[in-house]
Regions:
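The N-cap/first-turn positions of alpha helices
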Residues: 2-5, 30, 63
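Pre-recognition alpha-helix immediately N-terminal to the DNA-recognition helix
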Residues: 7-11, 65, 72
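DNA major-groove recognition helices of helix-turn-helix
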Residues: 9, 39-40
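Hydrophobic two-helix hairpin corresponding to the core of helix-turn-helix DNA-binding domains
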Residues: 9-10, 22-23, 60-63
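Short helix-boundary/capping micro-motifs
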Residues: 12-27
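A short LG(V/I)-centered, amphipathic sequence patch enriched
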Residues: 41-59
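Alpha-helical linker/hinge and terminal dimerization helices associated
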Residues: 43-44, 66-81
């Protein structure tokens, strides 16, 4: 679990679940964003995003809780700078 994964989840949420747009905004590759999110989901043992095939469809209920926690963590990290 790391801040990059948190940023990827946050940006995917901000970009209407569009991983390509999230990757562009973060200056990285879409497959890298997708892989990082999947790894975070596996580590946490929750599905953050519901998928249809490879596309993100919605944020799950557990995902909403994860996203809220990520937002708090990222805000606190920002306060350290």
């Amino acid at each position: 679990m790391n801040l990059h994964q948190f940023r990827f989840v946050q940006e995917a949420s901000r970009r209407n679940l569009n991983l390509t747009e999230a990757a562009k905004a973060l200056h990285t590759s879409q497959p890298g964003v997708s892989k990082a999110i999947i790894e975070l989901e596996e580590e946490l043992g929750v599905e953050i995003f519901a998928r249809h095939g490879k596309r993100l469809k919605r944020i799950t209920e557990p995902g909403q809780h994860v996203l809220k926690s990520i937002e708090v963590i990222m805000r606190e990290v920002g306060n350290l700078k």
